[in-house]
A protein has these predicted regions:
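Alpha-helical transmembrane bundles and membrane-interface segments of multipass inner-membrane proteins
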Residues: 1-159
């Protein structure tokens, strides 16, 4: 039971935190941006109908299909490798990625776009949200781990 309870609870808490931050952004940032560090970082509300960096605007159906495929693959991976202690960190990253996908999917389903609000003005970085952080940083760490830490044999059997 604990094997499924911890990941599901983590998924719910992470997704809930993402949704809470988006709710707060929609309610407190609608009037004007809040500059936290002048010329560096601000909270600026925007609604993104596209993917990362605003690509594929207005193609929500594509995001639904992509989210379903990726989430199915993550569930498959998680179940297949749930007894592999060496792969625990990968399973944790999968929870963060899933939470990010679900968080942005909730926005698309209920408001038709994704709520973004973090803006790094110093480098004019595209506006993003907590779910985007979950996805992007987890993917970066996952790629680094797969290239530098894990070997093919780590996926062949528990141990």
């Amino acid at each position: 039971m604990k094997k499924i309870l911890v990941p599901i609870t983590s998924l719910i808490l992470l997704t809930g935190f993402d949704q809470l931050t988006k709710y707060l952004a929609r309610h407190f940032l609608s009037a004007s941006p809040k500059v936290l560090i002048d010329g560096v970082f601000e909270l600026r509300l925007t609604f993104n109908t596209g993917a990362a960096f605003g690509i594929l605007k207005g193609m929500n159906w594509l995001f639904y299909v992509f989210a379903a495929i990726v989430l199915a693959a993550i569930v498959f991976f998680y179940k297949k490798y749930s007894n592999y202690p060496k792969l625990k960190v990968i399973r944790i990253l999968m929870i963060f990625i899933s939470s990010g996908i679900i968080g942005n999917l909730i926005d698309r389903i209920f408001i038709g776009s994704v709520t973004d609000f973090f803006y790094i003005s110093l480098i004019d970085f595209p506006i993003f949200n907590v779910a985007d952080i979950y996805i992007s940083w987890s993917m970066v760490l996952l790629v680094i781990l797969l290239i530098f830490k894990f070997k093919e044999s780590d996926f062949n059997g528990p141990g």
